[in-house]
Structures are given as C-alpha cells and as structure tokens.
Amino acid sequence: MDIQYLMRQAKKLEKAMADAKEKLAEIAVEAESGGGLVKVAMNGKCEVTRLTVDPKAIDPNDKAMLEDLITAAVNAAVEKARTAADESMSKATGGIKIPGIAG
C-alpha cells in the first residue's frame, strides 16, 4: 500500500470537507407550521436566519399554541437543514460516512 498516495488522498478529503463546511452557511431551507402561520428559515449550520409569525397566530390567551407552532417550525427546519448538510458533506467526501461531520 502506498502511504504517500493515502496521505495525498487524506489531504484532498480534508480540503473537500473544509470547503463543504464553509458552504453550509450558504444552504437555505425553510419550514412552516400551522398552515404557514409560523415560518422559519435556517442555513445548513442550523442557524435560524429568519422567523416570521402571522399576526393571526398571536393570541394573548393562547400563548402555548404559538409556542407549539414555533417549536414545530424550528424542528422541521432543523431536520431539513441537517438533511441538506448531510447531502452536501456526502458529496464532499464521495459518500464516505464520517460521524459527527454534518448536523
């Protein structure tokens, strides 16, 4: 086995992974709950970039409903962001699964 070759391949993989990680911020996903009453935009790093709440969802007497809608929208966005990040990292690594790299 050629150690030099393996080292070159490892360096290529390392660079591809670093490039892919940088691009995670460029990935954009959106999710909603309550039929669009709450919308969340998130990047591939699972950072919320926008949260919108329709005024119809704001009921001072039902704070729990709004909290549930926000939670559901954020969780849906996180799932989409993780999936998109996993796909991006998989492309960078040629399909090699590396635990803990994305999401």
UniProtKB/Swiss-Prot annotation:
NCBIfam families recorded: DNA_YbaB_EbfC (TIGR00103)
Function as written in the Swiss-Prot or TrEMBL entry: Binds to DNA and alters its conformation. May be involved in regulation of gene expression, nucleoid organization and DNA protection.
Subcellular location: Cytoplasm, Nucleoid
Organism ancestry: Bacteria, Pseudomonadati, Myxococcota, Myxococcia, Myxococcales
A GO molecular function held by the record: DNA binding
Protein family per UniProt: Belongs to the YbaB/EbfC family.
Keywords in alphabetical order: Cytoplasm, DNA-binding
Source organism per UniProt: Anaeromyxobacter dehalogenans (strain 2CP-C)
GO CC, alphabetical: bacterial nucleoid; cytosol
Superkingdom, natural source: Bacteria
InterPro entries with a match to the protein in the record: YbaB-like_sf, YbaB/EbfC
Name recorded for this polypeptide: Nucleoid-associated protein Adeh_3636
Pfam families xrefs: YbaB_DNA_bd
Assembly: Homodimer.
Principal place of residence: cytoplasm
